Amino acid sequence: MAFSVNYDSSFGGYSIHDYLGQWASTFGDVNHTNGNVTDANSGGFYGGSLSGSQYAISSTANQVTAFVAGGNLTYTLFNEPAHTLYGQLDSLSFGDGLSGGDTSPYSIQVPDVSFGGLNLSSLQAQGHDGVVHQVVYGLMSGDTGALETALNGILDDYGLSVNSTFDQVAAATAVGVQHADSPELLAA
């Protein structure tokens, strides 16, 4: 699946970095740390208790701001390496209001931004060093650094970065990755 971005048109002029910074400051840190784990700050999986096709959580600061991670995700809990999320991360959606999860897929009720075709993966043995764990746990902690690093790696193929606006990214991804020897560029 090719990388894609969908967004509310009001965010078209925002850079990805600025949007994620705004989202993180609103979402906050759910404080899912040793000694502080509760149902409210643990989120949930669609498809199983510790694994599934989605992981989602709402902010503990405002109970509204949320994100949904899609792919094939598994959480180790006490299996080694303990407390590690791994697998395939294909999509991320951000916005307000979270529905579903028990008998239906999670969805954001008021979506802001979604990224598809992320194609990020980690093995269980990578533990907390795996990109899937770093991105999702980072978001749970209100830290978008790992996600921005991953997005920069993807956007570099389009000559863009997280400092590019959503409108710029959408235009570039609609055209696709162009290589110097692409027939489209040679004909120009």
Swiss-Prot record:
The keyword tRNA-binding does not apply. Induction: By iron depletion. Heme binds at H32, Y75. The keyword Heme applies. Keywords: Heme, Iron, Metal-binding, Secreted. One of its GO terms (cellular component) is extracellular region. It holds the Pfam family HasA. It is found in: Secreted. GO terms for molecular function: metal ion binding. Can bind free heme and also acquire it from hemoglobin. Conveys heme from hemoglobin to the HasR receptor which releases it into the bacterium. HasR alone can take up heme but the synergy between HasA and HasR increases heme uptake 100-fold. Monomer. This is Hemophore HasA. It comes from Serratia marcescens. The gene is hasA.
